[in-house]
């Protein structure tokens, strides 16, 4: 049963975000919406809800269709509203009292603890705020559910919980979701739409298989274009040769033949379409200055504690060696970020290092945290690069342009940049530090899929030694060659991440 029919849809905001978009949404569809940051995913969802008028095309919806849209952020008027009330207020006022049981059902399905339900939204973590917005949307039982980056701010446990929740929805409820989490897309979708400025292909496959099909289609298109252009070139050469013979011999027949060959060449050239070339959001490059040290960090049963001294776990005897790409696994609150912080302190200020943590003196640290706190919101990208790395204005601007920063962006306060733009600036800062050891806490948080894959490639191509924390399962599987797990207040080495993923349902 067709619920939404999108025909020849296009939106132009300066440049075309997408055009000639055709999509039929049927009962039971679970559609993954994939595009780079700022390329129109949220815009398309806004067109479907009717809050944005497209530049061209039309959207037809089934009579009486209701659409639930879970946006990326909590509306400011709801900040002071308790979790439970924020969901209750989504019901019609005349039903709020008699139908309040529906709120309880939704909150139970999302495993929201009783204590959490009475807390104002502004006091909750980003992950719980996302779940509050999801509950607020679903309590009204919409016919179609739209989710915009639903895994943002969620830890692995909550991502697995959200996957289970989505897969337990009534089978006929269509879901359209935008996400950069490849494993999440694979677990929750059965169709994939790749949003592009011209043709936006759709595949009846989850992300990974759809991406393989897309890459093959693009490669086939590139081969066809190259073949057509070669044939056109040959036709033009034949036409030029015949033209010379025709002029010298005065043959009208050869002149006509020449014209026909040129027309065939023009027809081929006009019809030939170059293969899609993704416009990069900016290059991500890393560096590795190397070190002669074999062992970079030694842990001798160090106690990892909270700032007030509460023991989280003990490390046992562990070594970080050159070439290691260690992924630190553990539940939320186990102490992953705390260990990263203690390692950072031991490398940057050895005299203040905790007992049991020793870093080789030749280490040069490349550090990135999930909040990108190392980048001051009041500073500008151009100011950051010039001051930190003693480069001139022209060189700094060239570096920023290579990272995808326009002239306007370079002079903006960093606090006004998008998460993706800040992440790429952070990666440039890492590269210019020329480290030989990386400490990365949730490095893919604000990166689109292209950025994630580039970061994976750079870490492996440079044989960079690193210790990282990430809830991105695809990234962990691609990058890690050693895995440490925090379990029962001990740090233990495990063969791979799959056992941990399975334990949290991921």
What label would you give each PLM region?
Residues 1-221, 291-506:
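ABC ATP-binding cassette signature C-motif
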Residues 3, 95-96, 213-314:
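Flexible nucleotide-interacting loop at or near the entrance of a catalytic core
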